[in-house]
Amino acid sequence: MNNVISSKDNHNHTLVFTGKGGKYFVICLVNFLLTCITLGIYAPWAMVKCRRYIYTNMTLNNQPFAYKATGGALFISVLLVFIIYIVSLSLIEHGHPGLGFTLFGLLIAIIPFMAVKGLQYQAMMTSLNGVHFGFQCSMRRAWWYMFALPVLLMVALYIVLYIISLVTIAVGGLVFSIVFLGLLAIIGIGVINGITYSKWMTLFGNGANFGIHRFSIQVNVKTCIRGCVLAMLTLFPFAVVIGYLIAPVFTDMILLSMMGNAQAGGALILQYYGQIMACYFLYFLAIIVVTSYLYVALRNLFLNNLSLANDSIRFHSSVTAHGMLWRLLVVFVISGVTLGLAYPWLKIWLVSWLAQNTQVQGDLDSLELTNDEKPLENSPLMWISRGIMPYFPFI
């Protein structure tokens, strides 16, 4: 193993992705065929092969990443979770609802613990220049940030909206109440997302390591909330237009129902078919717009505040919301038109763009490359969690 990561430029190192769409297409095609033939059993191996191709073709200063996870480990994990789920349903259906719901509830409650163990496994299976990544954090804190806090915030938002609705309906009427409460709900969800994601960033950033070196991060909660609220507010104009287009449909359907002519609903749908399809289009467009803005805001906030080895190495993300938006639109539209055949090329194109806008800043020559000798945990919880791959929109 090399003792240092060699570099000509010790200040700014851009990730380079060398993957090819044609090769990735062959991998995806073989994976799809084998997954269909095996009725889905091959899916974990397919996932590992796709991820391994992405990792091994991603280089930092001419050093490729490595990914050593196995499809067998993921398959056993998914199988164990599936068995627990089936057993709980079987208990409910065969006269033991208390025991069945308890088992199912426990499975839901330990999802944060499984996410942590899944992150540990994925980190240990990822390496750069022979040095493995790692992840450790408090299980109690993970459960609070990933499960309890979001649930409590959503309950609090529901209570606040319910109390406000009692006032707005009496003062401004039904239409005003719907619009006002809709706007408040969007803002409230943005605030909840901002608080939750800021805690997740802190948990993940301060819990990760590269060999013997620790990552660290300081996230401004207000900045995270502002980014999430602005992302959610992009939904509002779409919601207004969709409501304007779809309101006549519901109004006419209610009138037909009151007149006892509900059977004419089919003809009514045909009459408003264009407006209904426009609503579907605007709905999916709104999702892409929100996803683009939210992903860019969170990714830039996370990477631009992340550091390694006592701030000697820092990271920078320069992706833009408009760049992400039009790329996602191209991915969805062309993938849909080609029935998914173009997706491998588009995925490689998107990953390459993300790599070009990700930099590592610092003197990599002086970074000691020594593995953390802590072995991979082999507990039952780890076995059941290896197939859990939590998605964080800021990575």
Curated annotation (Swiss-Prot):
List the GO cellular component terms.
plasma membrane
Keywords carried by this UniProt record: Cell inner membrane, Cell membrane, Membrane, Transmembrane, Transmembrane helix
> Pfam families given for it?
DUF898
| Protein's membrane topology | Multi-pass membrane protein
Periplasmic domain ranges by topology: 46-71, 117-146, 190-229, 297-327
* Disulphide-bridged cysteine pairs: none
Enumerate the Cytoplasmic topological stretches: 1-24, 93-95, 168, 251-275, 349-395
The family database entries (InterPro entries) matched by this protein are listed as: DUF898
Subcellular localization, per the record? Cell inner membrane
Q: Which residues cross the membrane?
A: 25-45, 72-92, 96-116, 147-167, 169-189, 230-250, 276-296, 328-348
| Protein name stated in the entry | Inner membrane protein YjgN
**From which lineage does this chain's organism come?**
Bacteria, Pseudomonadati, Pseudomonadota, Gammaproteobacteria, Enterobacterales
